[in-house]
Amino acid sequence: MTSKKYFTTLTLCSLIVFCLSLNAQIDPGVYISDVDNVRHELKITDGYMTHSVYETSPAKFIKTTGGFYTVQNGSLDIKLEFNSNFENDGQKELSIPFAMEKGQLTLKGDSPLVFTQSKHVKQELDGQWLFATRGPDTGQERRGDENARKTLKYLQDGRFQWIAYNTETFKFHGTGGGSFSSQDGAYIEKIEYFSRDDSRVGAELKFDYELKDGDWHHRGKNSKGEPMYEIWALRK
């Protein structure tokens, strides 16, 4: 191979690698960045993500955002469904430069953050669930993606988050999250952040669950100790 052909081939290879890096996809999973006492937590699936920020000790909720994303030219472009700080910043869209390498995700905003991907933990209730109705199911009207008022519960790799919001008005009604387990009909949450009441952090809530006709039937007592029976539908 002549020197000219060699350098031409090398240049083409470098260009291909560069183009691939610009359009690199983000591996689905949970990503954590701990900076001093502040935790940033990302949950990412194909096309959807949430970002929650909270202090760990003492517990204090800071903010959460989430929505549908695309990756283009090294940028994470997000069309938000919810933004807990919307009344202050008015943001409905975000565009964040990023890099993905060896299980680490770097968001290159004004203050770059390096996230480490958490271990994959597969459980029966993994997925994104929308609140449908109160149980028992007697054929009553249900809420779904067509409704502006939504309550989403996002379960992934042993981490959970619920968010109540309105996609038309962008009014934010609350969120909470932490770790969870779902096994043999027992669903357990351990709260690590809660926008409505920081004092609830550390509480462990136990529920019964059953999957029936694709729905999640969720029974037990809520954070106030009141009986509850909810039916959640898997978001598609």
Question: Residue locations for each model-derived region?
Answer:
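Lipid interaction determinants
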Residues: 22-73, 77-175, 186-236
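Beta-propeller blade signature
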Residues: 177-182
